[in-house]
């Protein structure tokens, strides 16, 4: 910090010496009253910089730290509250998940598993001749109904498209 401050001071002193040299050169070149007036205005606009001591810099830093510290503490407190609420939500969700898992384990077979019977070749079901005939009869009836539905859909399309202007 001290090194940077020393560099800044050296740079400022260098700038001041350059401005002085330039103003001296301009004064020596000024041959007309108009030029003298212009140079006078330029020199009046030159800003002067003062050195700032290290104790002043430290005092300013301490003032800023004292001003900012309560705000930072408030922000940290708010973040801690939010984190604790998120932790409690996480615990609640974990316990709810465990409860749901235990409920699922109590019912090993879902409704679908009970209804769906795998249709493997290994699962051969013995049926009587009557049941087989009834099944074939139901399949024929099903095919007839499919055909009837197709015919009705076709008639419906014909009636809709037949009414369209050509």
Swiss-Prot record:
GO cellular component: cytoplasm; DASH complex; spindle microtubule
Coiled coil: 119-160
Biological process annotations from GO: attachment of spindle microtubules to kinetochore; cell division; mitotic sister chromatid biorientation; protein transport along microtubule to mitotic spindle pole body
InterPro entries per the UniProt record, alphabetical: DASH_Spc19 (IPR013251)
UniProt keyword Coiled coil, yes or no: yes
Family matches, as Pfam families: DASH_Spc19
UniProtKB keywords: Cell cycle, Cell division, Centromere, Chromosome, Chromosome partition, Coiled coil, Cytoplasm, Cytoskeleton, Kinetochore, Microtubule, Mitosis, Nucleus
Cell division listed as a keyword: yes
Compartments, as annotated in UniProt: Nucleus; Cytoplasm, Cytoskeleton, Spindle; Chromosome, Centromere, Kinetochore
Domain of life: Eukaryota
Family listed: Belongs to the DASH complex SPC19 family.
Biological function: Component of the DASH complex that connects microtubules with kinetochores and couples microtubule depolymerisation to chromosome movement; it is involved in retrieving kinetochores to the spindle poles before their re-orientation on the spindle in early mitosis and allows microtubule depolymerization to pull chromosomes apart and resist detachment during anaphase.
Subunit description: Component of the DASH complex consisting of ASK1, DAD1, DAD2, DAD3, DAD4, DAM1, DUO1, HSK3, SPC19 and SPC34, with a stoichiometry of one copy of each subunit per complex. Multiple DASH complexes oligomerize to form a ring that encircles spindle microtubules and organizes the rod-like NDC80 complexes of the outer kinetochore. DASH complex oligomerization strengthens microtubule attachments. On cytoplasmic microtubules, DASH complexes appear to form patches instead of rings.
Protein name: DASH complex subunit SPC19
């Amino acid at each position: 910090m001290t090194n940077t401050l020393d560099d800044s001071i050296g740079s400022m002193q260098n700038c001041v010496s350059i401005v002085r040299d330039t103003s001296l050169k301009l004064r020596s070149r000024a041959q007309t009253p108009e030029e003298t007036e212009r140079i006078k205005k330029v020199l009046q606009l030159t800003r002067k910089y003062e050195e700032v001591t290290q104790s002043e810099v430290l005092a300013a830093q301490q003032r800023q730290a004292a001003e900012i510290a309560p705000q930072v503490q408030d922000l940290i407190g708010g973040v801690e509250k939010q984190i604790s609420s998120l932790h409690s939500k996480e615990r609640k969700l974990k316990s709810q998940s465990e409860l749901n898992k235990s409920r699922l384990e109590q019912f090993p077979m879902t409704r679908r598993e009970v209804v769906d019977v795998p249709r493997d070749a290994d699962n051969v079901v013995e049926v009587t001749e009557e049941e087989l005939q009834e099944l074939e009869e139901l399949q024929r009836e099903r095919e007839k109904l499919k055909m009837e539905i197709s015919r009705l859909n076709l008639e419906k399309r014909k009636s809709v498209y037949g009414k369209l202007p050509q």
